[in-house]
Amino acid sequence: MQVSVETTQGLGRRVTITIAADSIENAVKSELVNVAKKVRIDGFRKGKVPMNVVAQRYGASVRQDVLGDLMSRHFVDAIIKEKINPAGAPNYVPGEYKLGEDFTYAVEFEVYPEVELKGLESIEVEKPVVEVTDADVDTMLDTLRKQQATWKDKDGAADAEDRVTIDFTGSVDGEEFEGGKATDFVLAMGQGRMIPGFEEGIKGHKAGEEFTIDVTFPEEYHAENLKGKAAKFVINLKKVEERELPELTEEFIKRFGVEDGSVAGLRAEVRKNMERELKGAVRNRIKSQAIEGLVNANNIDVPAALIDGEIDVLRRQAAQRFGGNEKQALELPRELFEEQAKRRVVVGLLLGEVIRTHELKADEDRVKALIEEMASAYEDPSEVIEFYSKNNELMDNMRNVALEEQAVEAVLAKAKVTEKPTSFNELMNQQA
């Protein structure tokens, strides 16, 4: 076998391989012998068909199959010999085959980039220093009460946390536009559902009033004909409602799984959940900064084949989220996912190199701790832990999570890490 390797462009490689004629003929003869043992041809007993008859009837197809097999096996031998690491599926370019002559073909593919980590000492990471305070727990309890609130009619003017029922008609340059009219539209204020200025125009008005507000559609608004346009909305305010928050009664508290129904028990449960969320948020904040610094410090070439593969993964995930199928997934424009796919590949290659250079392996104690932490959010943690322990795929996924954490810690060990006092709300809003 003769092998030559050339660089086509960037990470592209072209391997040219020549297979000796006698290797081909020996492989063809060997395969014809195997075929002769199995075929049935009229006039001959099974296994007793003369080789010349077998060769005449099956020779062409056997030779084609043998060539395909030899091409694959010789390519594998070639990349092992040349110590080449292909990325993605290779493209075979057959040469002209002539009976009794050596056969030359080419294989085109991309290789993984040679990654040499640098700039780790220049990475800057701010570690949030934050704790769950009594005030944070109070705020969360208020949120829980608001989620369970009922609505009652309000005589006064509408404000930021009220709910209103309105009729409205919108116009641009005196002309009504599609989608700009509604009757008995119920709007919970303060949730940012409407364009800027719409809710502000309602505040201060009472039920029974009719008024006009002036707003401007954002430049990034989805309807092309309304982007950046000034508009007027005639509004009939039919009803104003305010929240009636439930009291922290024993019955209310037990809805949240607090068996003793006490306020102290609810506060303890809420604090525990907030601290679990906080731990994850701190970890994610540190991780995202470390990875961002790693990517910025290491500009590497990325094989197009890996990006294409990641785009397919993202397409399928997007289709699944919206109830689509495989065909619909492949129809989604690749431009929607290209930037994210490239970044994921880059991060994977860089963290893979961190793992390789530090000879990291998943810490089983860490894996166990991660599973226990995740399971603590469920009603029966032991059931979740047992489910994971019996599922090899889930366990492998958790080992990958642990290994990624260990790689990030290896980056942080060389990075400049400073502590930054932060509030619970500030950190959680950064995660949103």
Swiss-Prot record:
Q: Which reaction does it catalyse?
A: [protein]-peptidylproline (omega=180) = [protein]-peptidylproline (omega=0)
Locate the PPIase FKBP-type domain: which residues?
A: 161-246
E.C. number: 5.2.1.8
Where does this chain mainly localize? cytoplasm
Q: Which GO terms describe its molecular function?
A: peptidyl-prolyl cis-trans isomerase activity; protein folding chaperone; ribosome binding
Q: Which UniProt keywords apply?
A: Cell cycle, Cell division, Chaperone, Cytoplasm, Isomerase, Rotamase
Q: Is the Cell cycle keyword given for this protein?
A: yes
Alphabetized InterPro entries for the sequence: PPIase_dom_sf (IPR046357), PPIase_FKBP_dom (IPR001179), Trig_fac (IPR005215), Trigger_fac_C (IPR008880), Trigger_fac_C_sf (IPR037041), Trigger_fac_ribosome-bd_bac (IPR008881), Trigger_fac_ribosome-bd_sf (IPR036611), Trigger_fact/SurA_dom_sf (IPR027304)
Task: Report the record's Gene Ontology biological process terms.
Answer: 'de novo' cotranslational protein folding; cell division; chaperone-mediated protein folding; protein transport; protein unfolding
The record's subcellular location field reads: Cytoplasm
Q: Which GO terms describe its cellular component?
A: cytoplasm
Keyword set includes DNA damage: no
The domain of life for this entry's organism is Bacteria
Coiled coil feature spans: none
Question: Which PROSITE patterns would you find in this protein's record?
Answer: FKBP_PPIASE
In the record's own words, the domains note is: Consists of 3 domains; the N-terminus binds the ribosome, the middle domain has PPIase activity, while the C-terminus has intrinsic chaperone activity on its own.
User: What is the role of the protein in this entry?
Assistant: Involved in protein export. Acts as a chaperone by maintaining the newly synthesized protein in an open conformation. Functions as a peptidyl-prolyl cis-trans isomerase.
Q: Which family does it belong to?
A: Belongs to the FKBP-type PPIase family. Tig subfamily.
Q: What is this protein called?
A: Trigger factor
